[in-house]
């Protein structure tokens, strides 16, 4: 059973009673997932940019948006219009499929993994986690990468507060660390 199907059939009903809502449309849901990688020092190197684009598109299965500098910053050796990062916004079926792979395949492959921090919510029910290595994803072959680079994954929900967002992600199977 896919995560989207499980959400519609079991998780929604469970959250309806757990959070004591009167209407099924009040139950929080994941609206989008943003995967972002800043290039940092590698911004001057075109090979790193190409590698980041192919890695993120392999992981997410979607075309990558190259983020560019809005203004020149001499201290960071950045000119206006230079590529400084890559980002992907996932919605719909691709979002649920990515979330399922993240929870069931990628996160358990992290070395010394004891769960993700339950404190990484932003106050509005959105969750952000940083991944230090891209090789935790099964789509990335260890032999084909030139450097180990991380990424930021933001799970945006329409929950009103952190408790609702935490309850939603816990029901979806997000392995939160117990502090």
From Swiss-Prot:
Tell me the protein family, please. Belongs to the universal ribosomal protein uL5 family.
Describe the protein's quaternary organization and the partners it interacts with: Part of the 50S ribosomal subunit; contacts the 5S rRNA.
Question: HAMAP family recorded for this chain?
Answer: Ribosomal_uL5_B
Instruction: Name a single GO cellular component.
Output: plastid
Pfam families in the record: Ribosomal_L5, Ribosomal_L5_C
Alphabetized GO MF terms: rRNA binding; structural constituent of ribosome
Give the GO terms filed under biological process for this record.
translation
Q: Does the keyword Ribosomal protein apply?
A: yes
Protein's cellular compartments: Plastid, Organellar chromatophore
Tell me where it mainly resides. plastid
Q: Does the keyword Cell inner membrane apply?
A: no
Q: Its function? A: Binds 5S rRNA, forms part of the central protuberance of the 50S subunit.
User: What protein am I looking at?
Assistant: Large ribosomal subunit protein uL5c
* The entry's keywords: Organellar chromatophore, Plastid, Ribonucleoprotein, Ribosomal protein, RNA-binding, rRNA-binding
User: Per its UniProt record, what InterPro entries does this chain match?
Assistant: Ribosomal_uL5, Ribosomal_uL5_bac-type, Ribosomal_uL5_C, Ribosomal_uL5_CS, Ribosomal_uL5_dom_sf, Ribosomal_uL5_N
């Amino acid at each position: 059973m896919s995560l989207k199907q499980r959400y519609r059939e079991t998780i929604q009903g469970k959250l309806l009673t757990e959070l004591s809502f009167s209407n099924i449309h009040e139950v929080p849901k994941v609206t989008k997932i943003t995967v972002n990688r800043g290039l940092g020092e590698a911004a001057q190197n075109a090979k790193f940019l190409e590698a980041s684009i192919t890695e993120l598109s392999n992981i997410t299965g979607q075309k990558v948006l190259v983020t560019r500098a809005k203004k020149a910053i001499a201290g960071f050796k950045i000119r206006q219009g230079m590529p400084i990062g890559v980002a992907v916004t996932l919605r719909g079926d691709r979002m649920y499929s990515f979330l399922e792979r993240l929870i069931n395949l990628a996160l358990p492959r992290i070395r010394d993994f004891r769960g993700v921090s339950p404190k990484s919510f932003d106050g509005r029910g959105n969750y952000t986690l940083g991944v230090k290595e891209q090789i935790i994803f099964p789509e990335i072959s260890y032999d084909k990468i030139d450097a180990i680079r991380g990424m930021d994954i933001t799970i945006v929900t329409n929950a009103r507060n952190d408790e609702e967002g935490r309850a939603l992600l816990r029901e979806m199977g997000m392995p939160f660390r117990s502090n």
